[in-house]
Amino acid sequence: RAIGVWIALVAALSVFLHGMEVRAATFDITNQCPYTVWAAASPGGGQQLDQGQTWTIQVAAGTTQARIWARTGCSFDGSGRGTCQTGDCNGMLSCQGYGQVPATLAEYALNQYMNLDFYDISLVDGFNVPLSMTPTSTDPNCKGRIACLSDINSQCPSDLKVTGGCKSACARYNTPEYCCTGASENTCGPTDYSKFFKGQCPQAYSYAKDDATSTFTCPSGTNYKVVFCG
């Protein structure tokens, strides 16, 4: 009888855990820009996207420190090796890590604290292409669409401007004040540069400690759409 009870308990636990299991998230990445971009994802790789094209990736639950971005001004050979003006990742079409600055980032971590996904748009690495990030969930606890669609490149401060993009102050000067490192790690605040970026894109991270107005959540198991220029 004890064995029967134990088997019943194990079976019940198995059903419970199966119900808690969170599936991989699907990310549909679409280019609505009037020019070609080379989408990059870590994890995920990379894909050339002409205007109107979509690339779909699957990302495992529990993935952290993940990001999606657009590369511009790229040229790759038949083996997938080449260079990009912005967002380049070690000269590879299929990215195996993070890209070079400047690049507008869609960042996320899946199935974290309280079974939530955390997602944001970041300008901490600067800006190259407008983008939006939209969860598919209709859960009222899900923030919904976030976007950075301003034409920052045309308004970029002259000392941050580079071909095809606009660097952040941290990327340009690499000082504790702008990067929130060293003695400034726990005390740094907005600067004139970060206020410029925040004014252009209020929902995006403008510097490393800009969490309060820039991090959003959805229930785990949500799928997402990332759209460049839309």
Swiss-Prot record:
Pfam family, one: Thaumatin
PROSITE patterns: THAUMATIN_1 (PS00316), THAUMATIN_2 (PS51367)
Swiss-Prot/TrEMBL GO biological process terms: defense response; response to arachidonate
Assigned keywords, A-Z: Allergen, Disulfide bond, Pathogenesis-related protein, Plant defense, Signal, Stress response
SMART domains reported for this sequence: THN (SM00205)
Signal peptide range: 1-24
InterPro entries per the UniProt record, alphabetical: Osmotin/thaumatin-like_sf (IPR037176), Thaumatin (IPR001938), Thaumatin_CS (IPR017949)
Covalent S-S links between cysteines: C33-C229, C74-C84, C89-C95, C142-C218, C148-C201, C156-C166, C170-C179, C180-C188
Residue spans crossing the bilayer: none
Record bears the keyword Plastid: no
Function: May be involved in disease resistance.
Family assignment from sequence similarity: Belongs to the thaumatin family.
Protein name: Pathogenesis-related thaumatin-like protein 3.3
Protein's organism: Cryptomeria japonica (Japanese cedar)
